[in-house]
Every structure is written in structure tokens, then in C-alpha cells.
């Protein structure tokens, strides 16, 4: 059985955050390689299964019982926005380009929980469960994901992978779909190896203007 948490006025919260980002020095990054930057709010598309990373105030009925994370086909769902943040020690100033190999937190905008994984089996595929955890953006060390990409910085047009710092799995989708109450949504889980099921691309969102110019780099993907 699934359990739903408290409701809320989702759109005012999202609108307030997006307006807060649109201050001098913010806005869409249209220069250079079009980089993803710290503080940006975006949707992430799994490039193989064509679903966006999603969460909502519905908890898993098995495993950890934490807030569920899924993939949805809709492009206009407000529950698919995530904010790029640094670890608890910082290291991701607002507007700085995200480096390939950098560890980040992905915070779900409407619930304030961080993308998280741990050693629980996922409900459908029996891979590693991925959940949303924490309160107001504060969780634990299992919220950290390393951005694996080609070059020096995460480019908006490029495919990337997210490898979990604590358990080394890759954020993945393999096509399994849930029934009620989230019928049609896809299971998101962790897999131990890099493959076509775990490549993601930045899509819709608010991208903070880079505070430094990009430079040539290396290949991490």
C-alpha cells in the first residue's frame, strides 16, 4: 500500500522560487556551451525511456517507506522540477558551472527533499530503491550524486549520468510501470553499471547565468 503525505499549494511555492531566481545575475544561460549551473532549477529527461525525473508527496509502501521517485512522460508537471545544490559543506556557489566529476544534491522543489538512495530493493525491478529524503533540503551523505559527463562542465545539450557517491549505483530507468495510485509512472532505481538506461539530459527550467567562463577539460562519461 502506498501512503500520501500532506498536501499543499504547489504552484505558489514553485512560482515563488522561480521568481526568486530571476534576479540580476540570473536568467537563462545562453552563452558559450550553455552550462548547467549551481542553483539552477530544471527537469531531467531519461534519454532512453523519454521520461522526466519526478517526485510527489506519496511514500513507498515497501522498502524504506520514504517519498517515492518516479519517471513521468508529461513535460508540464510541476512535480518534476529539481534544484542543483552542493553538498552540506558547500562547494557549489550560485551561478558556478557544475563540473564533470562534481558531487551535487538534487533537491525536489515542491517537497524540499533530496534525491537519495540506499540498500533497499526497488518495488518492481528489485534494483536499488531511489527515494526523496530529508526536510527543507537537508538530509544526509546518501543524498550526494557525482555528475559523470564528457568535458569539464555539465553542458545543457549533453547526456550525463548521476552516480551515487555512497553506493556507486547509477540513477536509472528500465521501463517498469506502477499501478494505482501512480498508474503509468515509471520506476526509477539505481543500477551498478553505466548503460543506456542511465543517461539524462537537462530540459525545461531556469538556468542561472554562469559566473565564470568555461575552459577546456576532460572526458568523464
From Swiss-Prot:
Gene Ontology BP terms: cellular response to misfolded protein; chaperone cofactor-dependent protein refolding; ERAD pathway; regulation of apoptotic process
Cellular component terms (Gene Ontology): endoplasmic reticulum; endoplasmic reticulum chaperone complex; endoplasmic reticulum lumen; membrane; protein folding chaperone complex
Source species, domain of life: Eukaryota
Modified residue annotations for Phosphoserine: 215
Classification via InterPro entries: MIR_dom_sf, MIR_motif
Entry keyword annotation includes Signal: yes
GO molecular function: ATPase binding; misfolded protein binding; protein-folding chaperone binding
Transmembrane residue ranges: none
Expression by tissue: Ubiquitously expressed with high expression in testis, moderate expression in the pancreas, spleen, prostate, small intestine and colon. Very low expression is seen in brain and skeletal muscle.
Endpoints of the signal sequence: 1-28
Primary localization: endoplasmic reticulum
PANTHER family in UniProt: STROMAL CELL-DERIVED FACTOR 2-LIKE PROTEIN (PTHR46809), STROMAL CELL-DERIVED FACTOR 2-LIKE PROTEIN 1 (PTHR46809:SF1)
Protein name: Stromal cell-derived factor 2-like protein 1
Species assigned in the record: Homo sapiens
Name of the encoding gene: SDF2L1
Amino acid at each position: 500500500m502506498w501512503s500520501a503525505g500532506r498536501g499543499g499549494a504547489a504552484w505558489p511555492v514553485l512560482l515563488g522560487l522561480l521568481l526568486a531566481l530571476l534576479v540580476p545575475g540570473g536568467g537563462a544561460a545562453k552563452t558559450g556551451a550553455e552550462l548547467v549551473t549551481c542553483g539552477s532549477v530544471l527537469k531531467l529527461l531519461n534519454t532512453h525511456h523519454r521520461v522526466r525525473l519526478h517526485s510527489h508527496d506519496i511514500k513507498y509502501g515497501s522498502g524504506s517507506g520514504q517519498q517515492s521517485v518516479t519517471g513521468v512522460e508529461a513535460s508540464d508537471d510541476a512535480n518534476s522540477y529539481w534544484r542543483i545544490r552542493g553538498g552540506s559543506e558547500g562547494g557549489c556557489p550560485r551561478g558556478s558551472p557544475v563540473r564533470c566529476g562534481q558531487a551535487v544534491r538534487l533537491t525536489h522543489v515542491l517537497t524540499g527533499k533530496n534525491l537519495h538512495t540506499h540498500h533497499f530493493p526497488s518495488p518492481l525491478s528489485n534494483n536499488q530503491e531511489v527515494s526523496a529524503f530529508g526536510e527543507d533540503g537537508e538530509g544526509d551523505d546518501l543524498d550526494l550524486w557525482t555528475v559523470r559527463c564528457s568535458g569539464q562542465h555539465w553542458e545543457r545539450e549533453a547526456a550525463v549520468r548521476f552516480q551515487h557517491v555512497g553506493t556507486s549505483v547509477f540513477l536509472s530507468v528500465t521501463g517498469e510501470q506502477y499501478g494505482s495510485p501512480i498508474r503509468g509512472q515509471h520506476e526509477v532505481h539505481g543500477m551498478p553499471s553505466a548503460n543506456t538506461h542511465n543517461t539524462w539530459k537537462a530540459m525545461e527550467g531556469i538556468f542561472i547565468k554562469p559566473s565564470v567562463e568555461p575552459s577546456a577539460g576532460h572526458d568523464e562519461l
